[in-house]
């Protein structure tokens, strides 16, 4: 038997139901904020992610699915969504004008890492990217979007925020941090590698011993220039004004190299201690890194599998929908197909091609979470009617075929 590859999972039945629910909820919210859909390729040149995600990241260092294709191109399956969207923004020369572009995307991402609960080698993300707006109020709006999404999905969260500074305040802080790191011994191999490539990423290490060494490290948000400090204060003010609880985490740097200024992360205890379910921030330098005109960008990405795990844990009852249409005798199937074709212009209809007893049909309708049950037998044919049952309200009656649209 051929099985799915390790760390890759089929989405069907209840998982598929929750996937659609999450995507639909996200789309409804972000469209209200003026975002439109963008779709980028799953396969990109490796250099795109090495220049955007960064050589110091675990993604580039350890986790990319990369290979040489038949055209001798060094390519990889996309490990995250932002870089591809920025590439499209630049390739279409949208960086050359001053208009604001707001896009959302969703789809598969690929990272070769150890599979575990809520972490797969092929996983799905929903994300947004906003270009051309330098205002910290855009940062706040992006965060408030996620707050609204999680509110609609009834997911409890903790919001962490930080400021990573800009080109004015970052260099001095970087010097102070390198001096501090050089004075300490015992950091893990990843931290030693990051120290030379991007020392700020050392703060993101999950090793408990490394974190203990960082207890008295200089704090980034205490070394901000006046402009970054003002923006960070405005961000906190907006969140408070909108009733959003948050915590300033001075060691929050996110896992990718391209962030600057605002960084944020949503964590949840509903699928394990402090599991990240979404995160993002501002990346004003990334457009220039990828040969675009210097500009402004901010976005977030949300891990859909982790959201599904939370929703399934809540054991939410799958909502009934659609019509189950069936017959007691096969000779009526063709007539029902004509009825189903007309109903499908406005309704979801599952038509059974099998002749079964009423109880068996009702059992099958229940398994398919149908809301309305319609059945045709000899008596119904003679009266040009159907047996009708609402499987939610438990109401049943005979209805004329000519009255179907009115009843439904």
Swiss-Prot record:
Catalytic activity: tRNA(His) + L-histidine + ATP = L-histidyl-tRNA(His) + AMP + diphosphate + H(+)
Gene Ontology MF terms: ATP binding; histidine-tRNA ligase activity
CDD domains noted in UniProt: HisRS-like_core
Protein EC: 6.1.1.21
One Gene Ontology biological process: histidyl-tRNA aminoacylation
Location of the protein in the cell: Cytoplasm
Keyword Cell cycle among record annotations: no
HAMAP family named among the record's database cross-references: His_tRNA_synth
Sequence similarity: Belongs to the class-II aminoacyl-tRNA synthetase family.
Name of the protein described by the UniProt record: Histidine--tRNA ligase
Organism: Campylobacter jejuni subsp. doylei (strain ATCC BAA-1458 / RM4099 / 269.97)
Gene that encodes the chain: hisS
């Amino acid at each position: 038997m051929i099985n799915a590859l390790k760390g890759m999972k089929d989405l069907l039945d209840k998982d598929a139901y929750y996937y659609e629910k999450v995507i639909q909820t996200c789309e409804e919210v972000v469209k209200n904020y003026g975002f439109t859909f963008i779709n980028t390729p799953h396969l990109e040149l490796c250099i795109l992610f090495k220049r955007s995600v960064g050589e110091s990241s675990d993604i580039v260092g350890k986790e990319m699915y990369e290979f040489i294709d038949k055209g001798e191109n060094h390519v990889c399956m996309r490990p995250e969504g932002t870089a591809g969207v920025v590439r499209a923004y630049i390739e279409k020369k949208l960086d050359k004008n001053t208009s604001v572009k707001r896009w959302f995307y969703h789809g598969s991402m690929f990272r070769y890492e150890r599979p575990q609960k809520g972490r797969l080698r092929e996983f799905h993300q929903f994300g947004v990217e906003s270009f051309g707006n330098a205002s910290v109020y855009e940062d706040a709006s992006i965060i408030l979007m996620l707050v609204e999404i999680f509110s609609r999905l009834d997911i409890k969260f903790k919001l962490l925020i930080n400021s990573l500074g800009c080109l004015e305040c970052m260099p001095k802080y970087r010097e102070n941090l390198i001096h501090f790191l050089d004075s300490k011994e015992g950091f893990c191999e990843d931290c030693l590698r990051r120290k030379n490539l991007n020392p700020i990423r050392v703060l993101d290490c999950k090793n408990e011993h490394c974190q203990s060494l960082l207890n008295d490290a200089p704090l980034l948000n205490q070394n901000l220039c006046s402009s970054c400090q003002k923006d960070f204060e405005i961000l906190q003010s907006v969140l408070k004004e909108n009733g959003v609880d948050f915590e300033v985490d001075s060691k929050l740097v996110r896992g990718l190299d391209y962030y600057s200024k605002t960084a944020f992360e949503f964590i949840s205890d509903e699928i394990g201690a402090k599991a990240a379910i979404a995160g993002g921030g501002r990346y004003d330098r990334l457009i220039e890194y990828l040969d675009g005109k210097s500009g402004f960008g901010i976005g977030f990405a949300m891990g859909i599998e982790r959201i599904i795990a939370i929703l399934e844990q809540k054991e939410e009852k799958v909502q009934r929908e659609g019509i189950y249409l069936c017959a007691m005798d096969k000779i009526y199937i063709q007539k029902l197909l004509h009825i189903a074709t007309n109903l499908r212009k406005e309704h979801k209809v599952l038509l059974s091609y099998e002749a079964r007893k009423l109880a068996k049909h009702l059992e099958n309708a229940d398994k398919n979470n149908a809301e309305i049950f319609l059945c045709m037998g000899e008596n119904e044919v003679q009266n040009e009617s159907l047996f009708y049952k609402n499987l939610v309200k438990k109401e049943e009656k005979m209805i004329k075929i000519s009255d179907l649209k009115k009843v439904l």
